[in-house]
Amino acid sequence: MTKVFINGEFIDQNEAKVSYEDRGYVFGDGIYEYIRAYDGKLFTVTEHFERFIRSASEIQLDLGYTVEELIDVVRELLKVNNIQNGGIYIQATRGVAPRNHSFPTPEVKPVIMAFAKSYDRPYDDLENGINAATVEDIRWLRCDIKSLNLLGNVLAKEYAVKYNAGEAIQHRGETVTEGASSNVYAIKDGAIYTHPVNNYILNGITRKVIKWISEDEDIPFKEETFTVEFLKNADEVIVSSTSAEVTPVVKIDGEQVGDGKVGPVTRQLQEGFNKYIESRSS
């Protein structure tokens, strides 16, 4: 039987329940993280939980856990479910209290839940690339917080699905921000361009890894804003996330990117990413 973690206990998934008054359910008042496991080891887990705790701090939520304690939780979750390759979803809400927009009283504690599932790497997408569709970014102004409020992302992703695209690339006006569930990069003349870290994007963990690889390989990494037109005229385009890794984009809005094939810089980043899986998994 699959086990899930809820507030300090590992229980059968059939016994896992959420209160109808949980603030995550009625307000989306909470945060989450998603962590990848390769061969039974957690990839960049410290970076993920440092971001998790930062997100909690930004919404004035005291988790009551340290990074090390959270790592212990997800390690045990992998163990009890015998998962070697897959992902761990963990979220924290502001707890259970009568519905009121203001914060509950201090005795109300967060509800922390986590589950793990097995899945393989996205080999086909990594090898052949995906199509993407551009869409106006309608999300709130604190996209740096990994909030449970994902309605804007959901609507963007559904727009992409309707156009047979694997990702929605969002833009505010003409400025590209990020994907519905990824960071976005334009590669031009051997340099990588991506939106700077601020409140308009999530500072992705895979984005950090790509930056590390760029430093290792002496690839220019430019954290600058760029337009939809610049993106469509790039030599290569990639999106990155914990689940997507380093995924090439070969078409945007039905238009071919570059020569329509996965480019050399993308392949270089993918090779570097594989090396980091080995060196940063524990």
From Swiss-Prot:
It catalyses: D-alanine + 2-oxoglutarate = D-glutamate + pyruvate. It is an enzyme of class 2 (transferase). It comes from the Bacteria. It comes from Staphylococcus haemolyticus. The lineage of its organism: Bacteria, Bacillati, Bacillota, Bacilli, Bacillales. Pfam families: Aminotran_4 (PF01063). Its EC number is 2.6.1.21. Belongs to the class-IV pyridoxal-phosphate-dependent aminotransferase family. Signal peptide: none annotated. The gene is dat. Pyridoxal 5'-phosphate binds at residues 51, 178. Homodimer. GO terms for biological process: D-amino acid biosynthetic process; D-amino acid catabolic process. This is D-alanine aminotransferase. Keywords: Aminotransferase, Pyridoxal phosphate, Transferase. The modification N6-(pyridoxal phosphate)lysine is found at residue 146. Its cofactor is pyridoxal 5'-phosphate. One of its GO terms (cellular component) is cytosol. Acts on the D-isomers of alanine, leucine, aspartate, glutamate, aminobutyrate, norvaline and asparagine. The enzyme transfers an amino group from a substrate D-amino acid to the pyridoxal phosphate cofactor to form pyridoxamine and an alpha-keto acid in the first half-reaction. The second half-reaction is the reverse of the first, transferring the amino group from the pyridoxamine to a second alpha-keto acid to form the product D-amino acid via a ping-pong mechanism. This is an important process in the formation of D-alanine and D-glutamate, which are essential bacterial cell wall components. Substrate binds at residues 32, 99, 101. The active site is at 146 (proton acceptor). Coiled coil: none annotated. One of its GO terms (molecular function) is D-alanine-2-oxoglutarate aminotransferase activity. InterPro entries: Aminotrans_IV (IPR001544), Aminotrans_IV_CS (IPR018300), Aminotransferase-like (IPR036038), BCAT-like_C (IPR043132), BCAT-like_N (IPR043131), Class-IV_PLP-Dep_Aminotrnsfr (IPR050571), D_amino_transT (IPR005784).
